[in-house]
Amino acid sequence: LLDVVAKVDPVKTRIDSDIPLADHSQLPAPAQGELFKMHESIMEQLWQTSHLQGGNLAYVEQLFETYLTDPNAVPEEWRSYFDKLPSVDGYKGRDIDHSSIRQQFEHISRNQRFLASSGVPASATVDADKKQIRVLQLINAFRFRGHQEAKLDPLGVWNRPQVEDLDPSFHELSEADYDLEFQTGSLNFGSETMKLRDIVGGLRQTYCESIGAEYMHVVDTRIKRWFQQRMEPVRSRPNYESGTRKHLLERLTAAEGLEKYLGSRYPGVKRFGLEGGESLIPCLDELIQRAGSYGAKEIVLGMAHRGRLNVLVNTLGKNPKELFDEFEGKKLADSGSGDVKYHQGFSSNVMTEGGEIHLALAFNPSHLEIVSPVVEGSVRARQTRRNDPNGTQCVPIIMHGDAAFAGQGVVMETFQMSQTRGYGVGGTIHIVINNQVGFTTSKQEDARSTEYCTDVAKMIQAPILHVNADDPEAVMFVTQMAMDYRHEFKNDVVIDLVCYRRRGHNEADEPAATQPVMYEKIRKLTTTRNLYAEKLVADGVITEDEAKQIELDYRDELDKGDHVVKSLVKEPNKDLYVDWTPYLGHEWTAKCKSSVALKTIQKLGKKLTHVPEGFSVQRQVSKIVSDREKMTAGALPINWGYGEVMAYATLLNEGHPIRITGQDVGRGTFSHRHAVLHNQKDGAHHIALEHIAENQPKFEIYDSLLSEEAVMAFEYGYSTTAPNGLVVWEAQFGDFANGAQVVIDQFLTSGEHKWGRLCGLTLLLPHGYEGQGPEHSSARLERFLQLSAEHNIQVCVPTTPSQVFHMLRRQVKRPLRKPLVAITPKSLLRHKEATSELDDLTSGTFKTVLPEKEPSDPKKVTRLILCSGKVYFDLLERKKADERDDVAIVRIEQLYPFPGDDLDELLSQHSKLKHVVWCQEEPMNQGAWYCSQHHMRNALHRHNPKLYLQYAGRDASAAPACGHMSVHIEEQKKLVNDAFEI
């Protein structure tokens, strides 16, 4: 180690080796005193912070290195500590991470002739060494900040200041040094020594032309070296052969040609064209081909409206004639409401050098970015089905807009999920179609607070490759790097395709009203395709006539209505598809067997309660396991946790995979599930449901990150790709499900009607009024019922263990795939009355209408109370206390589709009814009252037109529940009293 004081900032390092730390005698006496006090102060801090002892040196050093690269990447307390470190000799600059400097010194040390040698004065050697270090600092500066001077903007409107760190004079290197030879250190171009002029020129070619690479924020040195080794040898400009360059021109011609064709044939019709960003099409083409060469079998794409029609026709091979029919408003022969053409999904198979690949473009709403986690979920399901844990066979590619990528919170959530156990997919290729404007907003100070729209990706240390979309070969190069990086490191990577929007937000919009200067420039711009054609003609790759013929040939194909993707497979391999035909054409009333033989229940019960030898279970959990053993033996009534877990066990035993995610699902928010046991000695875990049977399907249970929106969207995507399994998302409290309201509204309840997409996702939403206040009482049942129509979803409120057992099994065993919204209990999980017997699992099925266990004689009943959920047990307690044999209480366990026939059958048993009441815990404007009363009134009218349905419940309220226990108790008493007296 050099005994020197290093005084540095992020990219500038000055090493003053004149003052050894061991000898401060050269300093003036006052300075020596100040230095001693400073050292004494530092030592006092060190002694007060025991975590800074020598044994932790490597750890602290690594933290400091990380802090220097990205201060936000270290814990707040460490960041605060590092911020307060004193300067040396009053120098105010910040340190630079020494790992990169050490690399440079290693390279220098390998060639001794550039160190001090005999015959050279010592002062000259020291001066040369200082300059050499400054050159290495300059190299490092280009790697860190070269992207800030890259020529990324096709419009030339970016107002970017010069980066002083990239000027050799900043590093005290002058014009006189330009022809001197210096060690190149870890540079990957040229020889070991080069003239400074050539070093700077090479660095500018690599980092400051059409590509701006951000990768130095990545902590992993292997990744940084990987990018340097890819970019520097070719100066970010590989020489592509003429065949590749012609193919690029053909793809650009297709992208531009389709937009021109649609613009002339359907003027003024919205299509959200790709004009200005045509390089996206060759980018996608290369990604698909390169993924195929790595063994990919499936690629799932997600994107918003911009350029979607172009991708459908020119990438996925949709027949142009079908697109023209949509433009002309011809209704296709399908059911449902349909959706606009720029929301439609599509799938096809294309051929690559590595074999056939299935492409699927996800359907999406106008809610930008919400499709991203949907795509990730679909990919994860495909990887699970293919036993592809590394993500080689199934690849996600997601396209974004610059405004939405910077503005939508679900982008952050999706990135945060990317490296977790439950949601990782082995890396995603993100392409930002950065046309520099969001509808009418283009000023950076309005659109974001960050330098780039892509800065959010730095939170997971994703490399970001900015590229000028008017340079197709640069786009090709970053595309190849991106797919290679994903294959090598299994992480996300971002391509920032800096382009422009030639027209308005849509084709009927005039953009000059809000962006006059931008669109004055755009009107004068030559298209990307024509720029590249001119370049190829100038380079002698093609002639002008050949360039024109490529354009004419594409237009002829469109006129004929032929497929324009040459790699499209006309007779695709069906093994690459998921077969949904068994689930088509069935009604929700379709029957299925959900009961299970007693011997099977007992066998599975033993497996569920088996704890490995030496596994130390926490005391309360041990009691739960012991009780479950007794339940299996019939010695105890079964509770909710047993009924639910047994449903999972029986489905696994019958060959159905299961996936459960959500916050705290391993244990369950209310400590009822305990599907994951934790060893109290070493923290190891045991999941009995993973050991139900030999060769059983996969059981996955993951505690999710604290997100509702992205996680529910992920599970929606998963369930639309996994019809044979049970996919469950559970809210920590049902109240929090509305954090994913976009997913519920745009996908879950309307996806089948808009797009024909089947989905069997199950939502478990804890709900119940127990005095816990307005944020921990309501799953907003009324919202799901208000969204219910055309048998789009199921809304169930099970109140017994056997009901949840049959409900979950029915969701998989019935040949129907509809979302299930299950309003689940909290206090009922341990309620002495909310139990079932083993016989209830071995016979019967899910009952949509459920009477009391011991009902009153129908001939005596004059009052019928209809209800759902927990309030039933309050009503039952009151009935028993008052010995009201004239009252019958009936639970409607499925509120949608409403079981009118089953209610009719029950009503037919009661001929002497005088009063019928609907009782609910929720306020009148919430719960089931407004959305379900007409169903109940219709049933009553069929039974006896004179009967009138009355309401017993809380008064209408702006909040779901009150926050005071005393008020809650009074309200609860009143609504129960009303049910019996009104």
Listing of model-derived features with the role each one plays in the protein:
Residues 137-154, 286-315, 368, 398-419, ...:
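Conserved phosphate/anionic-ligand binding catalytic regions in large, soluble enzymes, centered on
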Residues 85-280, 296:
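Extended, charge-enriched "interface" segments that sit outside catalytic cores
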Residues 39-44, 53, 83, 90, ...:
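Thiamine diphosphate
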Residues 43-92:
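Subset of Sec-pathway N-terminal targeting signals
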Residues 297-461, 465, 670-722:
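Cofactor-binding active-site loop characterized by glycine-rich and histidine/acidic residues
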Residues 529, 539, 543-658:
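Hard-cation-handling environments
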Residues 236-258, 324-376, 380-387, 688, ...:
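Active-site cores of enzymes that catalyze phosphoryl transfer or operate on phosphate-rich substrates
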Residues 142-145, 149-182, 186-197, 202, ...:
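Glycine/aspartate-rich loop-and-adjacent alpha/beta segment that forms the canonical ThDP
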